[in-house]
Amino acid sequence: MTNVKTNSIKAWLLAARPKTLTGAAIPVMLGCALAFIYGHFQLTPALLCFLFAFLMQIDANFINDLFDFLKGSDREDRLGPERACAQGWISAKAMKAGIACTTLLAGITGLCLLHYGGLEMIPVGIACMIFAFLYTAGPYPLAYHGWGDLLVLVFFGFVPVGCTYYVMAHDWNMSVTMASLACGLIIDTLLMINNFRDREQDAISGKKTIVVRLGAKAGLILYFLLGLAACWCCFYFLEIGKIYAVLLPQLYLIPHILTTQHMARIYRGKALNGILGETSRNMLIFGLLLTLGLIL
């Protein structure tokens, strides 16, 4: 894509990577479903949680774009979607300003949530912002040392699902824990396919992801097991009489198995970007099925 004017609206939209907002929406959606079934759902804090999640996702996208560019990780042989700074669509100076804006807006949204969740939400919000930077920035970028999967489990599982529920219910229970775990595992499939696709370039750049450390075959197996484990987590909901929350998510395994087989056939190269799209679709299917299962 060459017809992108530097620092234009189009450039910022591309840098924001709106397709990644699915991963931000699913945990909040599940937290809202849990609040609904326990009789605590409130529209205003729910909308604020969605807004905070979207702003933090865009913030993280900007941060990763800038610091991967500064570290030289976005090489010419990059297989994934084009990055704004590396392509010259957005200058490093402008991206820093963009990061400041999204961080500020997320902070303001977080302050609004304090009215519902209480002061205990302050350290959670601060942690979200700090780890958004530490993922690719700083002297020990966590994504470069194999911590990405754990961070996804925490910040796309327990934090957004649990805190969305908490700001409405001021409570935490085992249903929240299991939904958070399932959500974190399912969203980690997206990181796993990213790392599987980029394994050769990551090894050259010194990015020691789990796939780089354990190898491509292990990455393929882990990709499948993450989805399977997420479905297993749903069996907990039998304890609260939510049979549909057990059965409906199992339908996710059909596209997940097909995508895993497709991934194994392609194995390397830019064609794996198609698997990225399939994984995002499957992830949304799981989130919608579990949400529906909880509400029914």
Per-range role (PLM):
Residues 55-79, 189-211:
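Acidic (Asp/Glu-rich) catalytic motifs at the cytosolic membrane interface
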Residues 83-171:
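Intramembrane alpha-helical segments
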Residues 152-199, 217-220:
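Functional transmembrane core segments of multi-pass inner-membrane proteins
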Residues 29, 38-66, 122-130, 174-193:
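Membrane-embedded alpha-helical segments that form the functional core of polytopic membrane enzymes
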Residues 1-44, 48, 140:
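Topogenic membrane-insertion module of multi-pass membrane proteins
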Residues 26-31, 150-165, 183, 211-216, ...:
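Small-residue-rich segments of transmembrane alpha-helices in multi-pass membrane proteins
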Residues 239-296:
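Extended hydrophobic alpha-helices typical of membrane-associated regions
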Residues 76-116, 210-241, 280-286:
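Multi-pass membrane catalytic core of lipid/isoprenoid biosynthesis enzymes
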